[in-house]
Amino acid sequence: MPKSTNSVASKARRKRILKKAKGYWGSRGNVLTVVKHAVDKAEQYAYRDRRVKKRNFRSLWIMRINAAARQNGVSYSRLMDAIHKKNIEIDRKALAEIAVKDPAAFSLIVKTALD
């Protein structure tokens, strides 16, 4: 009996992997064995960096809040402590947005928290 191969599925699988490597330079974009490694590594980086992105944004918000807080004469840690003690329900993302877009409102929040 002749050897039976499922060439339709094989070709589809290769095509799917090669499609993920679109735009890669040199053999990383067209040699299947190299493409597999390149795509695997790219997916590992993507997985890792989806988590790192969350950390980076939180860090950015904290930096912005700290800069605005220091302009109002208080450090970030003392401001956040005061906000938590006064039970002011505002997250860092919103607080950073207010600090950048509306400094007057941020100053009011600082004054409310510290009184």
Swiss-Prot record:
Protein family membership: Belongs to the bacterial ribosomal protein bL20 family.
GO biological process, one term: translation
CDD domains, sorted: Ribosomal_L20
UniProt function note: Binds directly to 23S ribosomal RNA and is necessary for the in vitro assembly process of the 50S ribosomal subunit. It is not involved in the protein synthesizing functions of that subunit.
Domain of life: Bacteria
GO cellular component: ribonucleoprotein complex; ribosome
Keyword rRNA-binding annotated: yes
GO molecular-function term, one example from the UniProt record: rRNA binding
UniProt keyword terms in alphabetical order: Ribonucleoprotein, Ribosomal protein, RNA-binding, rRNA-binding
Name of the protein described by the UniProt record: Large ribosomal subunit protein bL20
Gene name for this UniProt entry: rplT
UniProt-listed Pfam families: Ribosomal_L20 (PF00453)
